[in-house]
Amino acid sequence: MEDTHYNVPQSKIDRVAAVYQHTGPNNSIELLRPPVYLEPNTYYGGVAGLNSTVADYFLFQQMMLNGGELNGVRFLSPRTINLMISNHIGDKDVYVWGPGYGWGLGYCILMDPGKATEHLSPGTFFWTGAYNTISWVDPVEDMVAVAMTQARPFGRVNFLKDLSAVASQAIIESHRHNPPTVMGYPIFR
């Protein structure tokens, strides 16, 4: 992950996206902040400030899907991965997301797609960012998704529901034309 930083180097500032915001009753978009170099800070929080690229974030999520390993290198133990993607709050509602979700160590976990009205599989784990970054890992479908928008306010568009619906439909269409098989026999007819 060569392009993930808390303090973006000045040499890479031309790769930082501007921040936009939705405004007014017609939902128009305007520039909020152009890319600027910020002096390095010393606070590295888990809640904000990390800058990355789609490619780097995808690699991280692929490592999570692989159980802590990427390209033959182990970064996290299977036990650590399991702790990160297991629900630790029981059947309590997740404040931000509502019913049908659980909470792991660093991820929101989709526990009940029906209650959550999501198109993803149970056990899908995901996280979002302040400027409508969304990424999820669906272990059942062996799928990683990353989308970055750089638009605020957060949650103006429900990317998790919208993008997961599109991805799920693509999987259904793929299965329709190339049905999965078990021992050579199609499992969908």
Predicted segments — roles?
Residues 1-122:
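Short, surface-exposed loop or secondary-structure junction motifs
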Residues 13, 153-154:
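Flexible, glycine-rich phosphate/dinucleotide-binding loops
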Residues 66-70, 80, 85-93, 112, ...:
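Short, gly/Ser/Thr-rich active-site loops of penicillin-recognizing serine hydrolases
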Residues 108-109, 136-138:
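Short, well-ordered beta-strand micro-motif
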Residues 121-125, 182-183:
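Short intrinsically disordered coil segments
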Residues 129-131:
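Short, small/polar residue-rich loop motifs at catalytic or cofactor-binding pockets
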Residues 135-136, 142-151:
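Short, well-ordered beta-strand elements
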